[in-house]
């Protein structure tokens, strides 16, 4: 007998044939999809039947670029705007980031990260990435990963090693010391849902660039993938200062970083000849659309698609994209490509081939199937097919903000251009219902919010961070508004 049978749904499978059942079913048994198809082929018996009339059943989303502790900094963009120089903005935020995270031990980090995970689950994410590089408190990563385990989500979690002039001494460590921590965390948290890997924050965070080679070798020794935040906001200036005339992909290759499978965050400012290499590598990319509005460069997603690469999509945490909604992210991805194409045309480049312009279908594929591939989880999730894990969501389109559908002919467009996080009704991971009617089944949401608020208030008081916050308190004025 089937455990859960979802009936009368508009089913987007993301399977090899990209089948869409306009009135279909999904059956789950023992945490896996038992069948998916038309209603006439639905199993007759099930322990639980969910009538999904008016809802879309589809694979869960994957947030493929994230920093879980940075949920603590939501609305920081309001403090620092306008951002006209991204490298300078990054330097300024690191100062605040290390001030706060120096007081985030395991227990505190767990409470902060729970809130971020709760937000993501309610948005429809079933898997997340993490690059944890704030390791002044050595058990901070434990707290973050414990929260992921507790949430029921899947995670591709990179414990990063950083050093160099931009890093406080207390946060700096060698590749060898970092790999010891990674191995400890892998032993503690690796499971069928969580994979912990070594991480390279990016090429600018190493006192000794050879540490990148050491991390690759360490990953190989422990049978692990490697995480690289592949972005160069300096647009080649850092590499030129080091006497390297190539691009960042070539720079990483020179240290052996790409000798095995890697997660590659952002892939920002790759050279044209580097795009041509992508089809020859097992490098899985995540794009972050909101950042490309910060610097005005747009997203060159068409260059990835031209090489047969379907990237995932990431938010880069609430410090960057305050709104974690995957629907908002998909919209911004399409708009960011438009921004990039306009820039490239002004530079004399050709427009993309028609097949490489983004559509609603393409960004939905990126946010689900592409995300699972980017996080090395496409063998278990990313599509609805028999034998895969029961990782799926129900999105309620029977609402004013997502109507009319014109007899379902605009459903993909509604998902991308109109849906909100509040459209997500139900979230399953491995067949377990983690969100039901928009609410968590594992956590008391009010307690999660209150715990995070209290921890952050305590840290702000201990560090003086409260003085860095906008003075929007009674008796104060700020930006010509008076607070009483």
Indicate residue ranges for each PLM-predicted region.
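Divalent metal-coordination and catalytic microenvironments
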Residues: 9, 26, 31, 54, ...
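Active-site gating loops and adjacent loop-to-helix segments of metal-dependent hydrolytic enzymes
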Residues: 72-109, 164-175, 233-261, 332-360
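Alpha-helical scaffold segments that flank or form the walls of functional sites
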Residues: 76-131, 136-153, 178-191, 453-455, ...
